Amino acid sequence: KYLSKEGYATGYIGKWHLGSSEPVKKEDRGGYDYWLGSNLLEFTSDAYETYVYDGQNKKVFLPGYRVDAITDAAINFIKLNQKKPFFLFVSLIEPHHQNNTDDYPPPIGYREKYTGKWSPPDLSSLVGSSPRHLGGYYGMVKRIDEAYGRMIDVIKSLKLFDDSAIIFTSDHGNNFKTRNREYKRSCH
């Protein structure tokens, strides 16, 4: 809201996870001008079938791998708003466990590329799901790196990079069922 008052175009794309309903009510969206999100993206979509809601709460299908679909929407927002200051919050769900199946679904071809590769020694010594899941997890992380690289490339090509602040954060890592029988929710 504050940035909008200062003339910024504001946008939110991806997983919200702060609302109490699906789709998220307009008054619960933090005041963003542009909205393309879902409160619980892991329940409204899967790796290759991404559904979000637009500013009018209409369900929107985004084609392709979910990281790529959200990234494509973000790049579109950047291009449409390049002539004025903008604030864009991109919330990727990956590298999140897919809730409807015991898997970390990476892009096609990425699981094979990373399965059997390096595993942190402390993780390898614990009983859990890392031998089965780490290849998919690493593939998801690699695709996130590529996605942010794509966004940064667009920002650079539009000559916006020197006047931009890019902040990357994460809400949780993963313990691969080594601390409890779930993939997260452990205090350690």
Located regions from the model:
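Formylglycine-dependent sulfatase
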Residues: 1-188
